[in-house]
């Protein structure tokens, strides 16, 4: 019986499910499912619809089942700087902002008051970009601190 491995790649404008397996000693890859992706404009904010994204992940998995190619494992890769805050019951807290939202404007200066840029870079090794998670978290701390309680 073939062993299949599923990779779900979710980018800013599209997502896809790639199924891999070994055939004659070589890795064979097949795109199983593809979907459009993007942030929604809501009340002047750029937000991800995580419920829709979850539905797309499930739809791709159902396509694998329909094809009779059930993966033994799967991995999901996303855009890396966005996140979802959860409460103690694993419920989403607040909006799920996209990295292109402007709420982080000026947050680099706020973070620098606590941790100088050179020190931040030394600790993280990450190039300074205003959409980095550290600036998003500072925006939460300043704009909606109740979410961090």
Q: Which stretches of residues belong to each language-model region?
A:
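N-terminal glycine/serine-rich phosphate-binding loop of ATP-dependent small-molecule kinases
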Residues: 1-94, 122
């Amino acid at each position: 019986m073939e062993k299949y491995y599923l990779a779900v790649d979710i980018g800013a404008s599209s997502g896809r499910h790639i199924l891999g397996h070994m055939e004659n000693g070589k890795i064979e890859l097949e795109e199983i499912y593809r979907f459009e992706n993007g942030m929604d404009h809501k009340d002047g904010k750029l937000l991800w619809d995580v419920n829709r994204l979850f539905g797309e992940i499930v739809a791709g998995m159902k396509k694998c089942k329909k094809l009779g190619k059930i993966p033994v494992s799967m991995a999901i890769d996303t855009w890396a700087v966005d996140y979802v805050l959860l409460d103690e019951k694993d419920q989403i807290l607040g909006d799920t902002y996209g990295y292109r939202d402007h709420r982080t404007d000026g947050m680099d200066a706020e973070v620098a008051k606590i941790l100088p840029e050179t020190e931040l870079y030394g600790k993280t090794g990450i190039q300074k970009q205003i959409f980095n998670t550290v600036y998003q978290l500072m925006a939460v701390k300043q704009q909606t601190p109740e979410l961090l309680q």
